[in-house]
Amino acid sequence: MLMKTTTVHAPASQGTSGIVLDSLRVAYHGNVVLKPLSLTIEPGEVLALIGPSGSGKTTVLRAVAGFVQPAGGRILIGDTDVTHLPPYKRGLAMVVQNYALFPHLKVEDNVAFGLRAQKQPKALINERVTQALKTVGMSDYAARYPHQLSGGQQQRVAIARAIAVRPRVLLLDEPLSALDAQIRHNMVEEIARLHRELPELTILYVTHDQTEALTLADKIGIMKDGSLIAHGETRALYQHPPNRFAAEFLGRANILSAIALGITEAPGLVDVSCGGAVIRAFSRGSHHGYNKLLCIRPQHLSLTPRSAYSNRFNATLQSVHWQGDLTHLLCDVAGETVRMVLTHVNPLPRVGDKLALWFEPDDAVLIEV
């Protein structure tokens, strides 16, 4: 069930505040839906929490907002333990997908709503509303009513209403999922711009869309079955996922059977038997002789070597799929299917051709089975 868009009418923040979840646990009627979770979101950081439906990501956000009472653990916003505080005392704002603007109020009055609830001076309200609408690019729509706006414009107004109260933390719960693809793409860019303009704002962004997460977040947390199974800086987590679920949830990945043969003289790299060849790949540990999986993103494969250290798989082309700017090739590598994505391939290889697939050691990572 969707929640109403909520602005928490707390006093404006003093400086930046991060979020600390300390062994946070949530249970409904004795059924544990969020296993003990510890996570730190640094002040001014954007953390995207992603995962499939029922993974617990929205439960985390609702607990931070104060709509769910934890069964254990603590929640800190800045230096304040807010675990048992009501939502309106937490100094945060929240926006979800069904923007819930007041239909009888003009845009400017919707944005001013939280400030008026705080009983702020009229001059301050006018200043904050003007600034918030300017920030989201809606200054020219201040006198319109919600029904006169598109879905994307309504979502901008909802975000303006949230930031107008100057929250310490902004919670976004799948705010773009009700929009069509092009508007959603534009709104992702708008939210990224918003954070550039408000770098002191700490954002917890919950989504099932990995593209939104990869575009917006400084760090990503991946949820599964009520547990946080991966967490790290966005680029590092995408490049070197710790396990198969994280690798595949963040985008397409080739997952191949592999055996680690031992460490090399190069820091972080191990020799690996995979795809009928001995290659080098990134590893978080000094594995030797264990059955592992090798993860390689399709776009990290090429038809020509990029360096003297490039790895090589011998492959047979199975199929070619052209999709505008991209060409998708499916290849057989030692009995396993490998996908690669290329741009501007001319001439295109033909089905049945023998190919050499090249990739850099750091673009391949050993992960757990």
UniProtKB/Swiss-Prot annotation:
Residues 19-250 form the ABC transporter domain. It is found in: Cell inner membrane. ATP binds at G51, P52, S53, G54, S55, G56, K57, T58. Signal peptide: none annotated. PROSITE patterns: ABC_TRANSPORTER_1, ABC_TRANSPORTER_2. It is a peripheral membrane protein. InterPro entries: AAA+_ATPase, ABC_SmlMolc_Importer, ABC_transporter-like_ATP-bd, ABC_transporter-like_CS, AminoethylPonate_ABC_PhnT, Mo/tungstate-bd_C_term_dom, P-loop_NTPase, Transp-assoc_OB_typ2. Induction: Induced when inorganic phosphate is limiting; this is controlled by PhoB. The keyword Cell inner membrane applies. GO terms for molecular function: ATP binding; ATP hydrolysis activity; transmembrane transporter activity. Keywords: ATP-binding, Cell inner membrane, Cell membrane, Membrane, Nucleotide-binding, Transport. The keyword Cell membrane applies. It comes from the Bacteria. GO terms for cellular component: ATP-binding cassette (ABC) transporter complex. Belongs to the ABC transporter superfamily. 2-aminoethylphosphonate importer (TC 3.A.1.11.5) family. Maps to a phosphate-starvation-inducible locus previously known as psiC. Probably part of the PhnSTUV complex (TC 3.A.1.11.5) involved in 2-aminoethylphosphonate import. Probably responsible for energy coupling to the transport system. This is Putative 2-aminoethylphosphonate import ATP-binding protein PhnT. It comes from Salmonella typhimurium (strain LT2 / SGSC1412 / ATCC 700720). The lineage of its organism: Bacteria, Pseudomonadati, Pseudomonadota, Gammaproteobacteria, Enterobacterales. The gene is phnT.
